[in-house]
């Protein structure tokens, strides 16, 4: 109450910011007359003047009014578009590293030119991030005319580009590209073997278009570069036979033994999209697997040797019960292609991780592709937080303002519209069944069609869009379907969607980024005519002129009919996605309307609010086909959406907290890697490693401060001879001197190792040997880092079970991840020293050949895939690996062992400094290694 009273007097934080920016707008407008008088060359010359002032120490903030005024004038001359005052405010919000929420049609693409131009003056590069290649190319080509006029270079960073093209794109003042490509380039840059092979510069300033889609919707899915791992194709095929033989349990058993309506073998948790075997399910699965010869008679699925089988059991169960064809994926050309649940687009080339994709392939009887090993990964949260300054723009950010601030430190500012909005948002209508809902939707569409009003119908899945299309065909209503299957025709369909009587069905936000203009998009239609080579030039000109002549009357006709009408056939779990659909209508002060039609069968209502609403309908004895249309019900649905949003926020935040652990380690490894690449000579590093490793070896047999009776000299001599190629007569030294100490023995061994090393260097020359050492070091770091990532994945999958032991899973994960990381660093020292000490080189040519082979083996990765894969939710079993973690007793062992398992999964000999396989968390030499 007090807050509301104060807001009335002082205005909200948003209003105060906008008011503050309006003062700067006045300063920009005051410069307009002066800037207008400049010639094109003088206007272009302003860029060089600004650059010199920035180089001399003037801040970009001080330069802002002049730079914005110059950019606006250049836009007026080149693009024939002058920035409105509210667009100048939007530009300022972006420059100050905030998120600008601007309604659809308010010109976000044009707004971005202001802060992009200003920040490009520093010469450190600006990245403009979009959601797909089409928008990146469209915006870059469209705005390049403006930037080039002002003397700035523009690059486009698209997937599949050649290495040289990428380097040129990043070297430009302004680089347009997709979020995925920027992230993958960062990962690839940290896998190169020469500094000249990198493409990115330091991350300076990024403007993220559709920031909610990139930083919120896609934040649960890390970018993963992976290569093929061991083949388990046969196992997926055999495991695919299991789910149909298991039955779902309805209801959950309570403490008093009640609650189960129908006993079964597994339970589904639709909210967290997880599946769990019941006790009877475990017994049945074990019996069936024993019959098929996959486990021994009477063996438990939780036995350590069956851990991987549990992984396959749960992957198959999730594939059959939680992932449905034409909703979560489609089958195209014999391949399973994921459907983005937020945009409805096909995500070709992306694969679910952890064996889930292979399980779905087995279910659909298509060719099963090999499982992948993670080579490098990063989340969008951690990638975008590396930019010195980050800003974003979208039509719908206010509902997620708290998350933007909490995770990224980005404040959201709602920018006023240029003209007052006229869209009418009608109350939701709720029906008992899906059939009644679709009948009402068809009635509404028919009414609009007869009145000449264009309609955009939003659906949440490809399946629903095709069902509605079928119903419209039966009703004799002509329409277009815009979903992932019609991706290529997307721009053409959207261009026509604002014409009178146009009916367009769109999956979620397919077509986002392209305005629906009332009366049709003349520019788009003209572009299609221009691109058609079969039409003669004079005919093209006539048709384009005809389009312009017709558009005015069509525009007025649609406005008179009420503008674009939006129909939502289902509420999404996020209010923001619903608002995005509504936002397609009423652009730039145009009329428009929207309404959602729901049924009690919809997942959101069924899971969160169905029983309550159904009880109201039953009490009111509502006849079939009658709808509830009441504010209390709409508020109830919005309350359910808020709960889901809060839960999804917690998941993303928890994911970030877990990934922050890996991120700290990633930074250390990448920093060390970069130092290695840039160093001319790493002799000091190699020497320090060798001394540390030799000390560990000697101390194992001749402990520090011990007496001669405790020494095992013959074993030390054998270890040095076999593992390090050092043939030393230590026993003779001991026999000759009764007063020799453990430290003197260590000094003697270290000196011998140094002499052997120097002899190898002398044979081939310092420069050649240093290059070889660098190759060995990089290859070892990369290989052990990959194995460490696999270890972290396995550790993460089982860590939630620590909660049952009254331990904090997050703290346990941090502790064990640190232990694994320390063990990995120790293993790097051991491995590098072993290779350098054991290498037998006779000539510089042999050395170069060995270095080339090492580099080739590491850098030439066959069958590399770039995934934006579903990441396991923190605190819940991971995708497809729910039970990898179920063996609490072996979780430590699996996590530790995986860090050092070879590519084929075989366990090598345990090193002294490796974590002990017993799971104690101690080093082997301080645990069971001491006993042996």
Swiss-Prot record:
One of its GO terms (biological process) is intracellular protein transmembrane transport. The keyword Ribosomal protein does not apply. It catalyses: ATP + H2O + cellular proteinSide 1 = ADP + phosphate + cellular proteinSide 2. It holds the Pfam family SecA_DEAD. Zn(2+) binds at residues 916, 918, 927-928. CDD domains: DEXDc_SecA (cd17928), SF2_C_secA (cd18803). It comes from the Bacteria. GO terms for molecular function: ATP binding; metal ion binding; protein-exporting ATPase activity. Keywords: ATP-binding, Cell inner membrane, Cell membrane, Cytoplasm, Membrane, Metal-binding, Nucleotide-binding, Protein transport, Translocase, Translocation, Transport, Zinc. It is a peripheral membrane protein. Its cofactor is Zn(2+). ATP binds at residues 87, 105-109, 515. One of its GO terms (cellular component) is plasma membrane. Its EC number is 7.4.2.8. May bind 1 zinc ion per subunit. It is found in: Cell inner membrane; Cytoplasm. Part of the Sec protein translocase complex. Interacts with the SecYEG preprotein conducting channel. Has a central role in coupling the hydrolysis of ATP to the transfer of proteins into and across the cell membrane, serving both as a receptor for the preprotein-SecB complex and as an ATP-driven molecular motor driving the stepwise translocation of polypeptide chains across the membrane. Monomer and homodimer. Part of the essential Sec protein translocation apparatus which comprises SecA, SecYEG and auxiliary proteins SecDF-YajC and YidC. Belongs to the SecA family. This is Protein translocase subunit SecA. It comes from Burkholderia multivorans (strain ATCC 17616 / 249).
């Amino acid at each position: 109450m007090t807050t509301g009273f104060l807001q009335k007097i002082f205005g909200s934080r948003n209003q105060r910011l906008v008011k503050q920016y309006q003062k700067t707008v006045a300063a920009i407008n005051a410069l307009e007359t002066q800037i207008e008088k400049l010639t094109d060359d003088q206007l272009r010359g302003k860029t060089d003047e600004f650059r010199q002032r920035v180089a001399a120490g003037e801040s970009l903030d001080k330069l802002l009014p002049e730079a914005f005024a110059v950019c606006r004038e250049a836009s007026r001359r080149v693009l024939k578009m002058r920035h409105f005052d509210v667009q100048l405010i939007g530009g300022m919000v972006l420059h100050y590293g905030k998120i600008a929420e601007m309604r659809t049609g308010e010109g976000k693409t044009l707004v971005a030119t202001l802060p992009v131009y200003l920040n490009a003056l520093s010469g450190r590069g600006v990245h403009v991030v979009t959601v797909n290649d089409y928008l990146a190319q469209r915006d870059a080509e469209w705005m390049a005319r403006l930037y080039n006029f002002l003397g700035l270079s523009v690059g486009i960073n698209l997937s599949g580009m050649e290495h040289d093209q990428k380097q040129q794109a990043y070297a430009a003042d302004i680089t347009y590209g997709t979020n995925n490509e920027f992230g993958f380039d960062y990962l690839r840059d940290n896998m190169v073997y020469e500094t000249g092979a990198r493409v990115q510069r330091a991350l300076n300033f990024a403007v993220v278009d559709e920031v909610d889609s990139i930083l919120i919707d896609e934040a649960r899915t890390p970018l993963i570069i992976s290569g093929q791992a061991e083949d388990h194709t046969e196992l997926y095929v055999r495991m695919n036979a299991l789910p149909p033989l298991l039955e779902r349990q309805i209801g959950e058993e309570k403490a008093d033994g009640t609650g189960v309506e129908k006993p079964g073998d597994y339970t589904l948790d639709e909210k967290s999209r997880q599946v769990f075997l019941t006790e009877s399910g475990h017994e049945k699965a074990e019996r069936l697997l024993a019959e098929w010869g996959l486990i021994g008679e009477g063996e438990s699925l939780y036995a350590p040797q069956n851990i991987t089988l549990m992984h396959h059991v749960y992957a198959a169960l999730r594939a059959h019960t939680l992932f449905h064809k034409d909703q979560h994926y489609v089958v195209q050309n014999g391949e399973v292609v994921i459907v983005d649940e937020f945009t409805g687009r096909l995500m070709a080339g992306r694969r679910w991780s952890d064996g889930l994709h292979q399980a779905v392939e087995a279910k659909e009887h298509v060719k099963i592709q090999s499982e992948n090993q993670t080579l490098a990964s990063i989340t969008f949260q951690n990638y975008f937080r590396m930019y010195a300054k980050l800003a974003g723009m979208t039509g719908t950010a206010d509902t997620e303002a708290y998350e933007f601030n909490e995770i990224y430190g980005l404040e959201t500012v709602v920018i006023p519209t240029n003209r007052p909005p006229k869209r009418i948002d009608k109350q939701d209508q709720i029906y008992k069944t899906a059939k009644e809902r679709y009948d009402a939707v068809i009635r509404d569409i028919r009414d609009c069609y007869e009145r000449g009003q264009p309609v955009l119908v939003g659906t949440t899945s490809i399946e629903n869009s095709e069902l509605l299309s079928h119903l419209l065909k039966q009703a004799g209503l002509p329409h277009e379907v815009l979903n992932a299957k019609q991706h290529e025709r997307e721009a053409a369909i959207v261009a026509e969607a604002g014409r009178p009587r146009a009916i367009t069905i769109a999956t979620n936000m397919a077509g986002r980024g392209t305005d629906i203009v009332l009366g049709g998009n003349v520019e788009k239609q003209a572009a299609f005519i221009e691109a058609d080579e079969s039409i003669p030039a004079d005919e093209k000109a006539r048709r384009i002129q005809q389009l312009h002549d017709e558009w005015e009357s069509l525009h007025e006709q649609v406005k008179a009919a009420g503008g674009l009408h939006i129909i939502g056939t289902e509420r999404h779990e996020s209010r923001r996605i619903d608002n995005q659909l509504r936002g397609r209508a009423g652009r730039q002060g145009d009329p428009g309307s929207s309404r959602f039609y729901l049924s009690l069968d919809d997942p959101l209502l069924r899971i969160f609010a169905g029983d309550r609403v159904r009880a109201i309908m039953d009490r009111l004895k509502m006849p079939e086909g009658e709808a509830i249309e009441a504010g209390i019900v709409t508020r109830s649905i919005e309350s359910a959406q808020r709960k889901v949003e809060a839960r999804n926020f917690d998941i993303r935040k928890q994911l970030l907290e877990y990934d922050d652990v890996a991120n700290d380690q990633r930074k250390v490894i990448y920093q060390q890697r970069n130092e290695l690449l840039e160093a001319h000579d790493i002799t000091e590093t190699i020497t320090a490693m060798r001394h540390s490793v030799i000390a560990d070896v000697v101390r194992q047999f001749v402990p520090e401060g011990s007496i001669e009776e405790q020494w095992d000299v013959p074993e030390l001599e054998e270890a040095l001879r076999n593992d390090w190629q050092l043939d030393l007569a230590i026993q003779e030294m001991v026999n000759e001197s009764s007063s020799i100490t453990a430290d003197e023995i260590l000094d003697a061994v270290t000196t011998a190792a140094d002499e052997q090393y120097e002899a190898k260097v002398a044979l081939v020359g310092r420069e050649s040997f240093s290059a070889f050492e660098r190759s060995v070091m990089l290859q070892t770091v990369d290989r052990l880092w990959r194995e460490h990532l696999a270890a972290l994945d396995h550790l993460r999958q089982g860590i939630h079970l620590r909660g049952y032991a009254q331990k904090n899973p997050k703290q346990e994960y941090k502790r064990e991840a640190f232990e694994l990381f320390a063990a990995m660093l120790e293993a790097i020292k051991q491995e590098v020293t072993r290779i350098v000490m054991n290498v037998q080189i006779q000539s510089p040519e042999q050395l170069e050949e060995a270095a080339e082979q090492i580099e080739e083996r590491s850098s030439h990765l066959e069958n590399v895939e770039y995934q934006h894969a579903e990441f396991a939710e923190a605190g819940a079993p991971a995708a497809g690996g729910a039970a990898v973690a179920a063996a609490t007793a072996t979780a430590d062992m699996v996590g530790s062992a995986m860090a050092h398992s070879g590519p084929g999964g075989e366990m090598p000999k345990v090193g002294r400094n490796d974590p002990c396989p017993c799971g104690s968390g101690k080093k082997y030499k301080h645990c069971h290694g001491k006993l042996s």
